[in-house]
Amino acid sequence: MAWRDRRGALRAILTGSACVRPASVYDAISIRIADDLGFPFGMFGGSVASLAILGDPDIALITLTELAEQVRRMSRAAALPVVVDADHGYGNALNVRRTVEELEAAGAAGLTIEDTLLPQAYGEAKPQLVSREEGLGKITAALDARRDPNLVIIGRTGACSITSLDDAIERALAYQAAGVDALFFTGVKTRAQLEAISAATTLPIALGSPPAELGDFDHLAERRVRIAVQGHAPIAAATEAVFKTLSAIKDGAAPKALTGLASAELMDKVTRADVVAERGEHFLGVKR
């Protein structure tokens, strides 16, 4: 599927009437599994990127080059649209332009730019936000950098949990007026907060890790929520599986005694072994 088609598929979700769950993806295998299972799109979160690329916690240590290369690998591996958490855009508004250019070229279907002050400021234990003016400048730069008009650019704010609901709405309205395609809110905890956001804005809404009170997807859809990101369990599950397997091997377990391993059939499927074999037969004269 061409980049334009993937981006069009993501836009169709935003303009639709349902609230969907994206798959948390982080590498070529995870995105292929998500694609095979029929997820509508994948979400490549910033915390997951830090884990997958560096093995570090989510403290803004990865570089744009590292992020874009991982997105490129995933985009090559499967046709599933990917929304990339581009964090703060890796610097000021000029850096944001470069971030959009690189992620668009890497095949991202969409990306989020947030207003969190990153990396963590000296002496500040709690998360901080950039000013409304700086946040808007980053969003404006992101929109200006876009070359494919189908690329989805989502303005993200963490103000609900850092400053106030009113501040979150004001920031969102500024991003909406600038021309973003959707609004991403983290820290929304109650139906009352969502009602206020939905009433004040007109764009499709994305929520980060909504709590149980916001677990009714029909209710979310009625409030224009089109995306509900529900954490990043796959990489945590994979980490646990690797830990258990290596622990068993270290303790002397025989290979045939190991449990929880992917079957040969599943490995062939996710590696697209049949496609590779067909190409080998066609181009190398290798009989299957």
Curated annotation (Swiss-Prot):
Q: Which GO terms describe its molecular function?
A: magnesium ion binding; methylisocitrate lyase activity; oxaloacetate decarboxylase activity
* InterPro entries xrefs: ICL/PEPM, Oxaloacetate_deCOase_bac, Pyrv/PenolPyrv_kinase-like_dom, Pyrv_kinase-like_dom_sf
Name the positions where Mg(2+) binds.
D85
Q: Which GO terms describe its biological process?
A: oxaloacetate metabolic process; propionate catabolic process, 2-methylcitrate cycle; pyruvate biosynthetic process
- How does the cofactor bind to this protein, according to its record? Binds 1 Mg(2+) ion per subunit.
Top EC group: lyase
Q: What is its EC number?
A: 4.1.1.112
State the PANTHER family in the record. OXALOACETATE DECARBOXYLASE, PHOSPHOENOLPYRUVATE CARBOXYLASE
* UniProt similarity note: Belongs to the isocitrate lyase/PEP mutase superfamily. Oxaloacetate decarboxylase family.
Function, please?
Answer: Catalyzes the decarboxylation of oxaloacetate into pyruvate. Seems to play a role in maintaining cellular concentrations of bicarbonate and pyruvate.
Subunit comment for this entry?
Answer: Homotetramer; dimer of dimers.
What is the recorded name of this protein? Oxaloacetate decarboxylase
